[in-house]
Amino acid sequence: MRVHRLPENFSLERARRAQLAIARMVLEEDSLPESVRRAAGVDVAFKGDYAFAAAVVVEYPSFSVVDYSVTRTEVRFPYVPTLLAFREVWPAYTALKRLKSEPDVLLVDGNGRLHPFKAGFACHLGVLVDKPTIGVAKKLLVGEVGSWKSGVAPVLYRGEVLGMAVKTSERSKPVFVSIGHKISLNTAVWIVRMFTKRGLRLPEPLRLAHLYATAYARGNMEEKDFYLDEPS
């Protein structure tokens, strides 16, 4: 396994400028159909030199899987905190473009606005595909959790509410929900709750995307279901 190094033309200044540009492009208003029925969960797993991205479309209220894809791409960017979008957005995009059905909204494993530069993975992917997108993180990246009310608490960073901590069940740890693109924070929380099965922590599309991506990375799914998609 080779060590993944930063691209030769990389500069932190350019990366930050790109993040700020993405942050300016994010829309924080709802752009959804009247009836939201299909959500795609997006997650990326890594093993060796490859990224395994899964996109799983789940239909509400049955929670049935109506479409999914998993792609394998070569890792082109190392792990750099606050720059995860540069590592994950291409694999995620390749999985999304394989889908045959059109989801109403994307649920992404990672942060959106809840990011030091207001431009996490969910923002990058949402702007790239121009779809309503929600960031759902399992750990708090930045900010402080405020007072809880009805299982929800604001997450403040530098005096601004950038996300919401959401307890999807009484016994589970919270998830941290933030705007990715073309959605309001209140609607994002509502959709996360809507697509979460009773007693579980993660919304079903995202829970399944994590399982699918991990299974492919470990070689636990059939070869005939595997899509190989390398950048040209």
Curated annotation (Swiss-Prot):
UniProt name for this protein: Endonuclease V
Residue numbers marked as site, Interaction with target DNA: Y79
A Pfam family annotated for this UniProt entry: Endonuclease_5
Organism: Thermofilum pendens (strain DSM 2475 / Hrk 5)
Family: Belongs to the endonuclease V family.
Record's subcellular location: Cytoplasm
Any one Gene Ontology BP term: DNA repair
CDD domains: Endonuclease_V
